[in-house]
A protein has these predicted regions:
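Short active-site oxyanion
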Residues: 32-33, 93-96, 145-148
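Short His-Asn-centered micro-motif
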Residues: 1-2, 36-37, 98-101, 118
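Catalytic binding pocket for nucleotide-activated donors in carbohydrate/polymer assembly enzymes
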Residues: 103-183
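Conserved catalytic-core segment of nucleotide-activated headgroup transferases in glycan assembly
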Residues: 1-76, 151
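Amphipathic coiled-coil/heptad-repeat helices and related helical stalk/stem segments
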Residues: 11-18, 83, 90, 101, ...
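Acidic donor-binding loop of glycosyltransferase active sites
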Residues: 75-83, 88-102
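Charged, glycine/proline-rich intrinsically disordered loops and linkers
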Residues: 58-83, 129-138, 142
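C-terminal alpha-helical cap of glycosyltransferases
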Residues: 187-199
Length: 199
């Protein structure tokens, strides 16, 4: 599970839902959960869930550096080379990723691994609505393709994960097509292209 920043207030609720559902899978087939929080989220909002499901879930904190005074801004925080290795290894050793509209879907697509987007409101009558997240402009790039799976209810988590791991069901068969729409290819030239643009 890859978390979002504090502007997404129910990330801990989603994480607990995932843990509850996965804990119901029979033990010899139960997957472990790797949790990667958003690099700018230094809060303790996940601590209770991590403690409650110790042994099922393992937290891997991003290795980002903080610069200047504004500790909660992406403008002053940046990844280390070690974090790039950590992220690649996380993706390599994971079977799938779940999150709320995160670009981690693309990190997993690079290695042709599926993503599920959580698509339900864990708290009723909240001003924060999942429908608002998926109405952002950049999700228009998902139109007409099957790039991710959508989990529309907490009770769908277990079945979707189980089916992805233990059946021939393919989730997000167009994930590479979506990656090609979003990210300039070839991927191995992106760092060079970025440096040239900055210079």
């Amino acid at each position: 599970y890859s978390g979002n920043d504090a502007s997404s207030p129910y990330e801990a609720n989603y994480l607990e839902d995932i843990c509850e559902e996965i804990s119901e899978i029979e033990e010899n087939k139960r997957p472990q959960i790797l949790f990667r929080r958003c690099p700018v989220d230094k809060s303790n909002r996940f601590d209770k869930v991590l403690e409650k499901y110790k042994g099922l879930i393992f937290s891997i904190d991003p290795d980002w550096r903080i610069d200047k005074e504004n500790r909660d801004s992406f403008a002053t925080i940046y990844p280390t080379l070690n974090d790039v290795k950590l992220l690649v290894n996380t993706v390599f050793h994971s079977d799938l990723v779940l999150n709320l509209g995160s670009t981690m879907a693309h990190d997993f697509a690079v290695l042709n691994k599926p993503c599920f987007y959580l698509n339900y409101n864990p708290v009723k009558n909240s001003i924060f609505k999942v429908e608002d997240v998926y109405s952002f402009q950049h999700f228009n790039s998902l139109k007409d393709i099957d790039a991710v799976g959508f989990i529309n209810h907490k009770n769908d988590i277990k079945k979707n994960i189980y089916d992805t791991l233990f059946s021939s069901k393919v989730i997000g068969k167009d994930r590479i097509n979506w990656l090609n729409r979003i990210v300039l290819h070839p991927l191995e030239k992106n760092s060079k292209n970025l440096i040239e643009e900055i210079e």
